Amino acid sequence: MPVANNLRDCFPMIQSREEILKRINEEDHLKKTYYSWKEEERKEFLDMCTGARGVKMLYDGFFKEVMNPEYAPGRLGNFLSEVLGAAVRVKNVLPNDTTRLTDESSLLVLDIVVEFEDGRIANVEVQKIGYLFPGERSACYSADLLLRQYKRLRDERKKQFSYRDIRTVYTIILFEHSPEEFWSYPEIYRHCFGQTSDTGLRLKIPQKFIYIALDIFKKKQHNEGDRIHDRLEAWLTFFCRDEPEMIFRLLEEYPEFRALYEDVYELCRNVEGLMEIFSKELLEMAQRIAELERKLAER
């Protein structure tokens, strides 16, 4: 393990506490925002800025920047290759025309549709708080994506269209806080669903569902001595662990993640932009909690 106590030892672009506070106190609007936060929120912000803790990669502004397939297509492709258990390359980011309710959109960190080079499609979501009825909801959006693919291929190929042209549609969902059903399996963080018959008959039904419970992964990893067993677990560690010692371990075992952290810490040099990300996250978390409480009350 690297001998280091603070992430600044690995990433010298990280600013000091004094530099951050000096920048905040130079601008009245930044000072007003900073002191509008609770004391524990100010501490969390400074810890994140100064390397006392890692950045929370599931913050909307960070995740979308680091995993943006238009900026760095290999990153999302590499992650999805580990999720699917086979090498894939992202060819296109498709327009996401799926109709969503406003309250649902507020619960999503990432909602992106990508096409692989072999024509398969994946809808990738990151949810801060898992929705109620995750199976029914996923089925509806998978059906919508499948219908969109059918219409697109039919329009492109016209009389040459065949249903054999339909490629698998994957719905891949990462939960930061998993729905209660997932806690019935406290040792399993990745669940794959497909359609099978009760007779053994095999048909190609092009809908697959993969759910990854990050909170269950984190607890399981901690119980196993914080080991990183494979490259998928390396990605999940990157997404959900912000302890410096875990980041050091990840960098030692998988040094290719250094470039991702460097991108994030370059973003963090913009104190005003970072405060906007943090303020937005605080507001959206309050909205998510209120929405979850409303949905629970309706059950």
Regions found by a protein language model. Give the residues of each.
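Elongated, amphipathic alpha-helical interaction scaffolds
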Residues: 1-298
